[in-house]
UniProtKB/Swiss-Prot annotation:
Domain IQ: from-to ranges: 372-401
GO cellular component, one term: sperm flagellum
Subcellular location: Cytoplasm; Cell projection, Cilium, Flagellum; Cell projection, Cilium; Cytoplasm, Cytoskeleton
Family matches, as PROSITE patterns: IQ
Coiled coil: none
Name listed for the protein in its UniProt record: Dynein regulatory complex protein 9
Comp. bias intervals (Acidic residues): 30-45
Gene from which this protein is expressed: Iqcg
Free-text note regarding domains: The IQ domain mediates interaction with calmodulin when cellular Ca(2+) levels are low.
Other remarks on this protein: Early spermiogenesis defective 12d (esgd12d) is caused by mutations disrupting this gene. Affected male mice display complete loss of fertility; their sperm cells lack tails and are nonmotile.
Region named Disordered: 25-45, 394-419
Record family assignment: Belongs to the DRC9 family.
Keyword entries, A-Z: Calmodulin-binding, Cell projection, Cilium, Cytoplasm, Cytoskeleton, Differentiation, Flagellum, Spermatogenesis
GO biological process: sperm axoneme assembly; spermatid development
Length: 419
């Protein structure tokens, strides 16, 4: 069922690419999530929407009706009580009839096709509910309620957008609903990032406190070492200054003689350079005129190529924009599919945990029953022995045995006395 919904969402983007022109400016949701570390977020620019033509409105409304039908089928597929299923089927039939009456501009052929498709989809949904696998019947009532609420909310948003599109040719209600969902998600991410920042800041402050203590100790030690080092440097500097003074005097004399020789040589080279430059300027003037003529011809050719490439650029940008819109729609549908799979996995994990808990309870109960049975057997054996020993009830020992036992007891007493 999820794959069918993805195909339905992707189909209108391919049909409406060349005709629907919608411009939405502002920061996308991914960029907003990446900028959560900043304290202030940039304000998004307002959305600009152009009204759609009548043909586009009919196409988009047909697609939205198909989506609403798919959502109603999803409601029939979800395992609920039989009474609720009947009420949902009646509600879906009323919604389908109302939507058909609100679109009088459609042709009769489209209406008959949609009615037949709705009847087939309802029949498929009913058959699927009676042939559900056992895994779906294990879902809890809370998850079913959440799925039903999400499905109802999504169908209401699409229905409102379809009514608005049929009335005014725009879909601002759909954009407002998306904005609300985006704001709630952004607030949740803000709370998480603030908490993480607070924890990181506490850790950094603790580390900084330890670093400051270590730095202070190192600074005191380095200061003492630096004072001793400066004393040594002072003595070395005194000796170096005396040597440098002698060296600077000799070096100044040598530099003066060398600069005089260099100046004479440079003067000769400059005169030769002036003559060469004069020859080059004459040649460059001649080359400049030739290059100017050549560049004018090339300019004309480049202007022609520029016009050609500008037209090609406009066409390519339009094609790439259409591809980008298609990719965005595919990305949104894939994200919805992944979210559904994640929900299903969480539900299966909950079922497995409950099964393990139930098995553990049964094992403990069997052990308790076995222990009670053993204790009962021991108690019965003890009772029977005590009944026989104490002659309770019909159990009595023979008299000879009693006399013998008395004689034996008397003999034992006499032996003890003798000892």
């Amino acid at each position: 069922m999820d794959e069918e919904e993805v195909e339905v969402v992707e189909s209108p983007s391919e049909v409406l690419q060349p005709e629907v022109t919608v411009v939405v400016t502002g920061e996308p949701p991914e960029a907003a999530e990446e900028d959560l570390d900043y304290e202030e977020e940039e304000e998004t620019s307002p959305e600009v929407i152009e009204t759609l033509s009548l043909l586009d409105v009919l196409r988009v409304s047909a697609v939205m009706e198909d989506v609403i039908d798919q959502l109603s089928i999803l409601g029939y597929i979800i395992p609920v009580q039989y009474e609720r299923r009947q009420s949902l089927t009646q509600k879906a039939s009323h919604e389908g009839a109302s939507m058909i009456t609100t679109t009088p501009k459609k042709s009769t052929s489209l209406l008959t096709k949609e009615k037949s498709m709705m009847a087939e989809n309802k029949q498929r949904g009913q058959d699927f509910t009676f042939k559900k696998p056992t895994k779906q019947t294990m879902m809890t009532l809370e998850t079913l309620k959440k799925i039903q609420n999400d499905r109802q909310y999504f169908s209401d948003v699409i229905a409102n957008a379809m009514m608005e599109m049929q009335d005014s040719g725009s879909f601002t209600s759909l954009l407002k609903a998306l904005g609300k969902e985006r704001d709630s998600k952004m607030n949740f991410h803000d709370v998480i990032t603030r908490e993480e920042k607070g924890r990181k800041q506490i850790k950094t402050l603790q580390k900084q406190l330890l670093d400051v203590k270590r730095e202070r100790q190192m600074q005191v030690q380095n200061g003492n070492e630096y004072i001793a080092h400066l004393r040594d440097q002072l003595q070395e500097m005194k000796a170096k200054t005396n040597l440098e003074n002698l060296y600077m005097k000799r070096n100044a004399e040598l530099q003066i003689s060398q600069t005089q020789k260099k100046c004479n040589r440079a003067e000769e080279l400059l005169l030769e350079e002036i003559e060469k430059l004069r020859m080059k300027t004459e040649e460059e003037n001649r080359v400049h005129t030739e290059i100017e003529m050549f560049l004018k011809k090339q300019q004309q050719k480049l202007e022609e190529k520029l016009e050609f490439w500008m037209e090609k650029f406009d066409k390519d940008t339009e094609a790439k924009q259409n591809e980008l819109n298609a990719l965005k729609a595919a990305k949104a549908s894939d994200l919805v599919h992944l979210q559904d799979l994640a929900k299903m996995i969480r539900e299966y994990e909950q079922v497995i945990i409950e099964d393990r808990i139930e098995k553990e309870k049964t094992r403990k109960k069997l052990e308790q029953d076995d222990l009670e049975l053993r204790s009962i057997v021991k108690l019965q054996a003890w009772w029977r022995g005590s009944v026989v020993r104490k002659e309770i009830g019909n159990f009595k020992m023979p008299k000879k045995d009693k006399d013998d036992s008395k004689d034996s007891k008397g003999k034992e007493k006499e032996k003890r006395r003798k000892k």
